[in-house]
Structure formats: C-alpha cells, structure tokens
Amino acid sequence: MVAPSKRRPPVMADVAREAGVSHQTVSRVLNDHPNVRPDTRARVEEAITRLGYRRNLAARALVTKRSRMLGVVSFDTTLYGPASTIYGIEQAARTAGYFVSIVSLKTLDVDSVRDAIDYLSEQGVDGVVVVAPRRSAGPALESLPSGTPAVAVEGTLRGDVSVVCIDQAEGARLATRHLLELGHRTVHHVTGPPDWLETEGRLEGWRAALEEAGRPVPEPLPGDWSPHAGYAAGRSLAAMDGVTAVFAANDQMALGVLRALSEEGVKVPDQISVVGFDDIPESAFFSPPLTTVRQDFDQVGRHCIEVLLRQLDAGAGTCERLVVPPGFVVRSSTAAAARVP
C-alpha cells in the first residue's frame, strides 16, 4: 500500500494510486457515474475508506459552479410544524449531498426577511427555502435575486417562486365533515392567529363544509396556536348553549379546550366532541386521545428539497406547486351527538 504523506490529508491522486486506477475513474466513482465496472467501483470505494479520503467541497464548487449549500429562512421554530418541516429539509438535503444554512427570525417583517435572504445570498447558497407561512412574508420575497431557485412553504405572492403546501382547507373539511357525519348540527371553530396562511385555509375549509351541508355557521373564536388561547375558548364554549362539536385549528389549542371543558364539568366526547389539527406526537396521549387532522411535515420538508433540486437542474424560470394531502386520525375525543331530550 502506498500511503500519502502524514503531513497532509489524502487527495484524489492518492486514492487513484491506492486503487490502481486513473484520476478520472476516481472522479466518476465520486460523482456516481454509471459507466464504472462494479469491481472497479468497489476497489475505489475500499481505497477511499482505507485512506480516509474526504472530498474538497470548495474545489468541487469551483468546477461545478455550485456551493452545495442551501439556505432556509424560518419563523417561530418553537412551533411543532416549522420545526418538523426544517428537520425534513435538513435530512433530505444531507441525503442529496447539500449542507443547510438556517436563519431563524424572531419577527417576520419585510426588513428581517430581506436581511436573512441577503445574508444567505452572501454565503453563495444555490437555492432558498422560506418556512414562514404568513402573508407578511410575501412582500419580503421580492428581495430574492432574480433567477435564484426558491421554494416557499404554504404560499407566496410571487409567481416565479415554487410552493410546497399541505391542503389546509381539505384538512378542515375532513374534520368538519367527520363531526357532521356523527350527527352534530353544527361545528364551532377556534381559529389560528391572523396573517397565517394556515389560519385562512382552515377557516375556509370549515366554513365551506358547513355551508355545503346547509348548516349554520357559528362565529369563530379567536386563537393564537397556544393552549392558553384554547383554554380561553373552551371556557367560552362551555358557557354557550347547544355546543356539541368543536374544531380547533391546531392540537395545542385543542389541548386547552379539553382542559377548560374538563374543569367546567363537560364530558368529552359524551357532551362535546373535539377535533384538532396537526397530529403532534402528544395528541395520542391527551385525555381523551385526540381525533385530529394529520400533517406530514417531514414529507413537506423533503418535497421542498426535491422541488428545489429540480429547479437547479432545469435552470431559472421553472417553478411548480406541490400539494400534500392531509390525513385524518380518529381517536376517542369524538362521538355521535347526544340526543336532545
């Protein structure tokens, strides 16, 4: 075995000598070129392992004109959805051979988003994913350099930016129809905060399902994604006459609703059925276990990378919209409406 000097890390030429092949053959193996014999590929891979060879990504970037770096702009990563989406993005990017640079924003204003995009652009990222599903993020995306491959989670006002989203309205329809099919006359709704695209989609789907069924549409109760907001809404609902079904716009608010109803002596689901949205891991352990709309955030994150890489391969001017269907998980927090004496 011909070992490289201990004073420097192994380079591609060392791998070629070790495997008894040309520099070009090593390059083809590293780039997963199909025209390499299996036994030759195995020899090269064994040489790479023995020598501890690591690719020089900076040198590769000079040749390919790609940094192998993707940027992510995110808002409120303390929430389950954005955090899970970013995890899916990072895992998919790593599998594809890309690094991820993440900028987390405390406030979602135009200047903050523009500063984040400028910061990522200075790093020479090949593309950008924006995980900030609020209307106020839309104008800031105008600062994206023309031709920069970009994907927005949930939506954007720009026609040249791809979108990956879950069908929020359909998820709300699933929740509302489930309760109507159980015999409930109508369904009360605890909304998410204003400006969020998910809030709009779920409100739209809930209202549409009630109107399509010819049922009365109650005034929605305001929320902010937190259990505290759900608790306040639950106290209000417990004081109302004729409430038998509640659809909360996320599982955290549903948890607050359940707590408030329990404190008021209202039995779930015997007296009031409750449905959430997200299917967070804890929802199966609520009391009672929560019926909820399931969002596959990991799949959303992976689709973001798939769409972004397709844009990189196809060149500027290509964009697409990919919609992920929601699921629905029935547990113990919903039941047939109680008969009115």
Task: Show where each model-derived region lies.
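N-terminal helix-turn-helix DNA-binding module of bacterial transcription factors
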Residues: 1-68, 338-341
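Glycine-rich phosphate-binding loop signature in dinucleotide/nucleotide-binding domains
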Residues: 51, 122-124, 182-183, 237-243
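Alpha-helical recognition/docking segments in bacterial nutrient-uptake
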Residues: 1-10, 69-177, 181
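Hinge/beta->alpha junction and helix N-cap segments in small-molecule ligand-binding domains
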Residues: 57, 75-84, 102-111, 164-174, ...
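Periplasmic-binding protein-like
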Residues: 124-132, 188-191, 220-221, 241-250, ...
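Flexible loop/turn connectors
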Residues: 240-341
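Short beta-strand segments enriched in small/hydrophobic residues
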Residues: 25-28, 62-78, 178, 186-193
